[in-house]
Amino acid sequence: MFCIQCEQTIQTPAVKGCSFAQGMCGKTAEVSDLQDVLVYSLQGVSYWATQAHRYGIINDEINQWAPKAFFSTLTNVNFDPERILQLTSQAAQFKAQLKDQVLTASSLANSPLSEVPAVAEFELPENAQAILAFAPQVAVNRGKEGVHEDVIGLRLLCLYGLKGAAAYMEHARVLEQTNNDIYAEYHEIMAWLGTDPEDLGELLDCSMRIGLMNYKVMEMLDHGETATFGHPVPTAVNVKPVKGKCILVSGHDLHDLEKILQQTEGKGINVYTNGEMLPAHGYPELNKYPHLVGNYGSAWQNQQKEFANFPGAIVMTSNCLLNPNVGQYADRLFTRSIVGWPGVAHIEDDDFSAVIESALAQPGFQHDEIEHMITVGFGRNALMNAAPAVIDQVKQGNIKHFFLVGGCDGDKAERSYYTDFTEAAPEDTLILTLACGKFRFNKNTFGDINGIPRLLDVGQCNDAYSAIQLALALAQEFDCGINELPLTLVLSWFEQKAIVILLTLFALGVKGIYTGPTAPAFLTPNLIAIIQEKFDMRSIGNVQDDLNTILAA
């Protein structure tokens, strides 16, 4: 195996990347190698989908399936080799289908194809053993002996960024938001990456193209969520258990949460959100269910202890999944969509009766704990409605600076920086937060500035779109560029969704972003220097020194 896509990958002076029997995330070498073959197969699908598009052939099923399959290879999503093999086999079938259609259309149009790349002609070996034997030829760092390490680094930046965008495309699709222009662009980029490009300038341009495409995807996802569940409104959420039978819903999929809420009505089961599902409480069409009683737990890296202590059924709707056997709760864990773990029950459709049965068989919480309320729901609409009051406080000098502190959480001790940063931020500053990084400080008390809460929970990682809209509105009001605002982004990364959001911000021209806790292992020192120079990206350091630098600017 060779995998270097997440923040926790092995980084030593001698080794970069996971290349042993098991990755740091827990996936086996077998699963990692199978995922490499799946990605290569999907690049072949995208080549033929791109050619088909040129002949006016648009296959909605393949367009919507391909990003979903790519999503399955994102960190902490699918650890099940059988499921990965099924997706790879499906990719081979779709590729053959598109190829036949393209060759027929090409013949009818008397316009033969130019040279077809190897990724498009690849034939999937007949069995798992042969597929695994072939896998080293399509490793994500293939060809490293013949090109500069910067080329490999930028290829991976593009591949991982596109993977993050594919995840958001799937989240949008679940809410019936699709766009053939976006699918066409996705296929073009995916196919091009399958040809192993070597031009650094073209690769850097491609990363910006991915960022801009993802902005459109986040806009589409925002529309899907708000059209389906209403615009989020500031809402108090209890983060302590309530007596009764219970189901815990983790991941990002609001659609699944709604189905679970509908199917548990009147059954005496309380439903809790976990991790990135916390923002669900702000959506009126979800919060209207009285048995959506609160949020349980914290960020993904703590789930093995927290899930073990949860006395009910658990549903993983998307990333991030850890080995459930460690906490011995695999028998009451259920996976959905692209999530998988060997031996764990998987729900193929919207029927959650098995989850309900499991929840009723568990003891549930035996007593109410004293309430602890936090506030969520500062989505795009709420932020825009609050903008006049915020602008007034800025003009009066009561708000001196805005910070967006958020992103992915993780295990490393250096991540305490983000807690320390929010606690050290002066009282005349506002802090926006999003994604699971917020759990390092979202239960703390920050007070308010003349009625405006100092901590504003914007939502999930994809709700960076909402924060961008607020920044654009402020820039318009103050007649300045976005980089001239008293606004600083302090972001933490872990996996590929965070990578594509960073690319989106870069593509929109946002500069001076602080990132951490460490640089991606797939980026060489030279590439990091290029990105720092081009986008004024900063690495987090000492909290007080960073604050002094920011506020003195």
Swiss-Prot record:
Protein's UniProt keywords contain Nucleotidyltransferase: no
GO molecular function list: 2 iron, 2 sulfur cluster binding; hydroxylamine reductase activity; metal ion binding; peroxidase activity
UniProt-listed SUPFAM superfamilies: Prismane protein-like (SSF56821)
A GO biological process held by the record: response to hydrogen peroxide
Cofactor: [2Fe-2S] cluster; hybrid [4Fe-2O-2S] cluster
HAMAP family the UniProt entry points to: Hydroxylam_reduct
Binding site for hybrid [4Fe-2O-2S] cluster: 252, 276, 320, 408, 436, 461, 495, 497
Location of the protein in the cell: Cytoplasm
UniProt function note: Catalyzes the reduction of hydroxylamine to form NH(3) and H(2)O.
Lineage of origin: Bacteria, Pseudomonadati, Pseudomonadota, Gammaproteobacteria, Vibrionales
Protein name: Hydroxylamine reductase
Cofactor note: Binds 1 [2Fe-2S] cluster. Binds 1 hybrid [4Fe-2O-2S] cluster.
